[in-house]
Amino acid sequence: MIDIKHHGAVSGVTGSCHELVVGRSGILIDCGLFQGAEAGNGASASNLAIDFSISHIRALVVTHVHIDHVGRIPYLLAAGFDGPIICSEPSAIMLPEILEDALKIGFTRDRALIERVLGLIRSRLVPVPYEQWHSVFDGKDESLSVRLQRAGHILGSAYVECEAESDGEFERVVFSGDLGASHAPLLPEPQPPERADRLVIESTYGDKDHESREERRYRLKAVLEHALEDGGTVLVPAFSIGRTQDLLYEIESLIHEFGSDEVGPDLPWRDLEIVVDSPPILPVSTGTSSLSGTLKPPNWSVRAGTRSRSNNSR
C-alpha cells in the first residue's frame, strides 16, 4: 500500500506536515508550526503536539527552513522520532540557526537546553545534493528513495520526488514544498519534474496575479525617495529568510544603478544606510558565499550583506 496523509497545511497554508506511507513504513515531508489565525491562541500544546503515530516513520525530509515547515521538529524529536532529517546541503547549514531563534522566542531562554536540542538536530541531519537519488529504506517488500530538486523559493529550498515500492506496486509521488516565482534575482527558477503519479502541490498564491519584478523594484525606489525627501525612515517588516535577502539585493541593485544620484537631500544612493533587525538573517546572508553553487549567476553580492548593519538585540 502506498498512501498519503496530511498532518498540517490542510485547511490553511501553515503547519506543513505530510506523510507518505509505504507498506508498513513511512516518511514525513516537513514538520512546521501553525502560524497566524491557524495557530488559534498561540503556541498551545494542542498546536505543537505530534498527535499522530510516528513509530513507523523512518525519516523526515525538509523542503526548506521557513518556520511553518520546520518549527515542530523539536516536538517531533521529543515525541520519540529517532530517524534522519534529510534536506539539501544549504538547508542543513541554516536549519540550526533558524530553530535556535525559534526556540529562544517561543520555547525557552535556557541556553543549555537550547544547545542540547540543537546538538540532537545537528546529529540527525543528512544533507544530500540536488538531482541525486537517496535511498531511505530498501526492504524485501517495500522501498523508498527520494530526490531533491531546486524549488526556487529560498536558498536551499527543494521539491521532493519519491520513488516508492510496496508489495510490487510502484509509484512516483512528488511533494512541491513552496515554489518560487520565475525571474527571481538570486535563485534559478524551478524546473518541472519529469513525471509524477501523484502530486501534492502548494497553492498559497494560486489565485493572485503579482506585478512584475521590474515594476516592484522601481516602486521600492519611489517609496524610498518619497520618505527620505522629508528626512524620514522606511521600515520594512521582512523578517523571513528569503524575502530579506531579496530586498537587500533589490536595494543594492538600486544603489549600483543610481549611486551618485540623490535618494534624499544631500544623500546619494551610495551612502544609504540599511539596518537589519533580525538575528538569523545576516548569518544566513553572509554564509551564502560558501553556497554560491546554489545561486543564480551573478552570485549574491557580498556588498549587500556587508553594507547592512545588524541590530542584533535578541
State each model region's role.
Residues 3, 7, 22, 133-194:
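Catalytic core of the metallo-beta-lactamase
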Residues 9-10, 31-34, 90, 154, ...:
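Active-site metal-binding loops of divalent metal-dependent hydrolases
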Residues 10-15, 22-83, 87-125, 179-188, ...:
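Pre-active-site segment of Zn-dependent metallo-hydrolases
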Residues 96-157, 292-314:
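Metallo-beta-lactamase
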Residues 185-196, 212-227:
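Structured alpha-helical segments in the cores of large, soluble enzyme domains
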